[in-house]
Amino acid sequence: MKYDALFTPFKIGNMEVKNRFVMAPMGTNSSHIDGCIANDEIDYFEARAKGGVGLIIMGCQFLNPDLAQGSLEGILQNSYVIPQLTTVVEATHRWGAKICCQISCGTGRNAFPNMYGEPPFSSSDTPSTFNPEMKCRPLSEEDIKKIMTEFANSAIIAKNAGFDAIEIHGHAGYLVDQFMSPVWNKRTDEYGGSAENRMRFATEIVQSIKQAVDLPVIFRIALDHLFVEGRTLDESMELIEILEKAGVDALDIDAGCYERIDYIFPTAYLGDACMDYVCKEARKHVNIPIMNAGNHTPESALRLIESKDADFVMFGRQFIADPDTVNKLMSDHEEDVRPCIRCNEECVGRIVGRLTKLSCAVNPQACEEERFAIKPCSQVKNIVVIGAGPAGLEAARVAAAEGHNVEIYEKTNMIGGQLSVAATPKFKDQLKKLVKWFEVQLNKLDVIIHFNYEVKADDQILKNADQI
């Protein structure tokens, strides 16, 4: 098998993961306002577990509603959230996957003012990200102690729900990162100054969780902020050494922060495996497992694992685009893997821009697995699809998958419509891959395509069709 090395088991602490594929943590913005996750989210994660992923890291679950700031992610404050969490855990375990609960104490300076107009909290009175004229409120030592208590409480909730591991969100210039980084941490007490002091907030979180539950702890951290005055890769090495000594069982590493948000949601422009460069240096400094994210492909994943610079490779949006990616690779059917086009339109864009739940430009079933499930038709119809653009191709694919007889009429000599035109630049190769994927799928489904045929309003083919 081409990707054998990706299908070997590996341990994080006492947790054995069946392969090297990790679903990167991404919010879905689909939970209920009370902090309980929704059934759509359960179906979403189960589909990825069924698709062969070894470890799923859920999008961040907040300590309390104030930190969540209205975003519809889970909140680990009260025990009434446990039943729904147990359901998602058991749904993923059913398919042999492990599942990790990511816990967050919020975005700090990246947050908006609260409902009373008060500035967000941060490590120091650093400027707010969205309004530099507004200075953040530094956390007091009492505030910090409360956060440690809340982390322990949230960890217990995660443990009771059955999670296999816990990840601390120390990434992207969020609150934990604001303590770790001198560009934002100007404190003069025991939480500021030296690297050891700046790491105290993070290591106390690790200790709070470790004292509360016996689960592996993963720490998510960007090793290279990629902006002037931000933390560099070299400067981060001392920090990950401190994290290992504090008891962290694995590191989830990449690059970027809100000042370089193109790396937080890596675009097509950045190319493949755009953050794997952090792994080689990190490997020299720690002996715990390393996982890495950032526009990976099966080929880049294989290179990274075979180099031993990382132990797990993380895929985020690719698993949104095709939940069965892993199983298709394992069965040597890479041609059936639907590619993520790295557009950020219907995943990140829907959540950030429209405040609605996650979907996908190439997979409308994402977060709608049950409602949009493809089921065998009760009566076979003759269906005509006019135009072989992306909408026509998907309509034809779904209709044929349901069992209908489908024919496409396209006025040019090629499929893809504007996708094929847009795919001209080298960095848009993912669009070419999507067009090729449609070609393969339609061929396997015996969809007939008539090229150079412009359908007229009175065309006989329309009269003969059961559905257009």
Positions of predicted regions on the chain:
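Flavin-dependent oxidoreductase catalytic cores
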Residues: 1-386, 390-406, 414, 461
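Short hydrophobic core segments
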Residues: 409, 464-468
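A conserved short coil-to-beta-strand element within the FAD-binding core of flavoproteins
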Residues: 451-463
